[in-house]
Amino acid sequence: MTSLLVGPSYFKDISFLYEDYYKVALDGGYHYFFDNRIRCDLFIGDNDTNDILDLSLADKKIILNRDKDISDSFYAVDYLLDKGFDDFVFLGCLNGRADMNYLSVSLLSYIDKRGGKAVFYNDDEMMYLIKDKKEFDDERGRISLFSLSDESEIEIKNLLYEYEGKLSFDSSLCLSNRIVKPGYIKVKKGRLIAFQQR
């Protein structure tokens, strides 16, 4: 089952809010539902970024203690995984503060380790994990790859820059490649994080 989780960071493309997902507002992300008068299935947060007290557009509410050792997004993912969700789409979690962006990378890795998959969107890019093979058909544009493992073994075929070999965690080797025709990225060992232009 797929869940849409909406965080507080800025984005313009609200079309996702109208699609058939189980919709979760992550604290300040509730503004997007409230401002557009769209119902969400669940609100999760400690209300530290909301100046809206009216949570009437949320069918269910989980109010967290502000003195906690887990982020709203990690709490939500744990809750949803336990409810049987294994596919996650994130909006409003890939802009703004650098530490929150890094948190999203950690969350992407965590979801994978728990058997789920996720894609993070902003208006310009999407971020996702590759651990087997990712094929490209009609997509075009920039893509950057980084190893989430200490060292990954990869094959890049039919992108602007082809490559077969090792990619280490502290390498910029696969920064700013381009999808120019049908091709693929294959991970033989390790895990990659991809930032792909939308």
Description of each model-found segment:
Residues 60, 65, 116-119, 143-144:
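A glycine-rich helix N-cap at a beta->alpha junction
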Residues 61-83:
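Short phosphate-binding loop-to-helix
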Residues 110, 114-137:
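Class I SAM-dependent methyltransferase SAM-binding "motif I" and its flanking Rossmann-like core
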Residues 130-198:
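Long, charged alpha-helical interface segments
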Residues 1-54:
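N-terminal beta-strand-loop-alpha-helix module at the start
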Residues 99-109:
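Short Gly/Thr/Asp-enriched flexible loops that form oxyanion-binding sites at enzyme active sites
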